[in-house]
From Swiss-Prot:
The lineage of its organism: Bacteria, Pseudomonadati, Pseudomonadota, Gammaproteobacteria, Vibrionales. Its cofactor is heme. It is an enzyme of class 1 (oxidoreductase). It is found in: Periplasm. This is Catalase.
Length: 503
């Protein structure tokens, strides 16, 4: 390789390629004369404030970081496409599902949930599975996880739950004493805890895990008919997770194993695929379930699934910060034909996720290329920091006789019949333990053993015997064999566990 002032000459066999080097500039476009030495007052004098290039470099360096996501901080993304497997316009007027073979561009961000940016990807955690569909009706975000349920059912407990799972404000260490103290007061968490302490809580690859929308949503068709749906991404690569002994081994070799695997496989042309399935219930069918079908701690048991399309991820981001880090997902990013259900956790997420993105990225986050819709945006939202919109009109209000910008009545929210009165109380028929037992009994013996090993490992770090016994009693109520084996693994008195379970 030979380098001159203006050119790089690269010889490869019989091929020579000349690349003219671009001139280094400051942010205002002015060329830089010396990027190696500061301007000083003489050879041994102080650095001068007039060295605007130096000052700008230091200023920009100090401002490179934006606020970390409060949850889902560690993540990786990929571009791809979703192809509809049929015409489902009888169920929804949402663009991705209205014609067979319809192609919709997507961007997916996988993530851990609790742990910070830069933390090992081997840590036990649910995994975020967020998909942004760029449709001709606007952007739709399906913001889910790799597990089908969640720890809580009401968003009023979300900050408390996250605080308990995050590091202690005293030691800055995650502490099972703290989060099991919280969960001992939340029996509805039993189902999700069972899921996350299986080996699914430590996936071997983002490619080899499923994804779930977790919540129920409403699908609305052109006639205004309403059905409730749940979404399920099924990995066509199969399901592969790390067993307890494998977690330690992998972490010692590569604590970025999920990101490395996804990037390596996509760049090698091994593009991962997921089929998207939906479960569909009419409002009447939903009301007849023997549990609350709008409870985020529940799955819809024995409700058939319908395949609606396939997603392929085929390109890694050109720049991590510009695309993956600045991508902003929120369940409130909906399009015609999809509306939120009355799920209490989802209702809170509609606000919280959109609000945290405004905090991270500012009011004009939708102008960032990764978040920008394919369709033209016509709104009177204006100004704010870092606004690059092209606005010349004098009319920034609606309605106006001077500007034809009007709403379209066909996209009004669907009418929902209400019953009862304003109230503040827990849901009826919570059935906190039943589905955790169903899950436990569905596991093979090896998976049961790994579940007990994983769960007991953290419970054995709990120093308060009452908290530990209460937690074991929750799992005992889900399934006696489950609780008995866990009591044995944690040296917890089984008689005390049975007594607590009977209360």
């Amino acid at each position: 390789m030979h380098m001159s002032k203006s050119f790089l000459i690269i010889s490869m066999g019989f091929v020579a390629v000349s690349v003219q080097a671009q001139t280094l500039t400051r942010d205002n476009g002015a060329p830089v004369g010396d990027n190696q030495n500061s301007i000083t007052a003489g050879e041994h004098g102080s650095v001068l404030l007039q060295d605007v290039h130096l000052i700008q470099k230091l200023q920009r360096f100090a401002r490179e970081r934006i606020p970390e996501r409060v949850v889902h901080a560690r993540g990786t993304g990929a571009h791809g496409e979703f192809v509809a497997s049929g015409d489902f316009s009888d169920l929804t007027l949402s663009a991705p599902f209205t014609s067979k073979g319809k192609i919709t561009p997507v961007f997916v961000r996988f993530s851990t949930v609790i742990h910070s940016k830069g933390s090992p990807e081997t840590l036990r955690d649910p995994r975020g599975f967020a998909t942004k569909f760029y449709t001709e009706q606007g952007n739709w975000d399906l913001v889910g996880n790799n597990l089908p349920v969640f720890f809580i059912r009401d968003s009023i407990k979300f900050p408390d739950m996250v605080h308990s799972l995050k590091p202690s404000p005293v030691t800055n260490l995650q502490d099972p004493n703290r989060f099991f103290d919280f969960f001992s007061h939340e029996p509805g968490s039993t189902h999700m805890l069972t899921w996350v302490y299986t080996n699914l809580g430590t996936p071997a690859s983002y490619r080899t895990m499923d994804g779930f929308g977790v919540h129920a949503y409403k699908w609305i068709n052109q006639k205004g008919d309403v059905n409730y749906v749940k979404f399920h991404w099924k990995s066509l690569q199969g399901i592969e997770s790390l067993r307890p002994d494998e977690v330690v081994k992998v972490q010692g070799q590569d604590f970025n194993h999920l990101t490395n695997d996804l990037y390596t496989q996509i760049n090698a042309g091994n593009h991962p695929k997921w089929d998207l399935y939906v479960q569909v219930l009419t409002p009447e069918q939903l009301s007849k379930l023997d549990y609350n079908g709008l409870d985020a701690t529940k799955v819809w048991l024995d409700v058939p699934e319908k395949k609606v399309g396939t997603m392929t991820l085929n390109k890694v981001p050109d720049n991590f910060f510009l695309e993956t880090e600045q991508s902003a997902f929120a369940p409130s990013n909906l399009i015609p034909g999809i509306e939120p259900s009355e799920d209490r956790l989802l209702q809170g997420r509609l606000f919280a996720y959109a609000d945290t993105q405004l905090y991270r990225l500012g009011a004009n986050l939708f102008q960032l290329p990764i978040n920008r819709p394919l369709v033209e945006v016509n709104s009177h939202n204006q100004e704010g920091a870092s606004n690059s919109a092209q606005t010349a009109s004098d009319i920034n209000y609606q309605p106006s006789r001077k500007l034809e910008l009007k709403e379209d009545p066909q996209f009004k929210a669907v009418q929902t019949q209400l019953v009862g009165s304003v109230q503040q109380k827990a849901i009826s028929n919570p059935r906190n333990f039943y589905q955790a037992g169903v899950l436990y009994r569905s596991l093979n013996e090896q998976d049961k053993q790994d579940l007990i090993t994983n769960l007991x490992g953290b419970l054995n770090k709990v120093t308060d015997k009452e908290i530990k016994a209460t937690m074991v009693s929750h799992f005992y109520r889900a399934d006696k064999d489950y609780g008995t084996r866990l009591a044995r693994a944690t040296n917890t008195d089984l008689k005390q566990v049975a007594k607590l379970a009977a209360m």
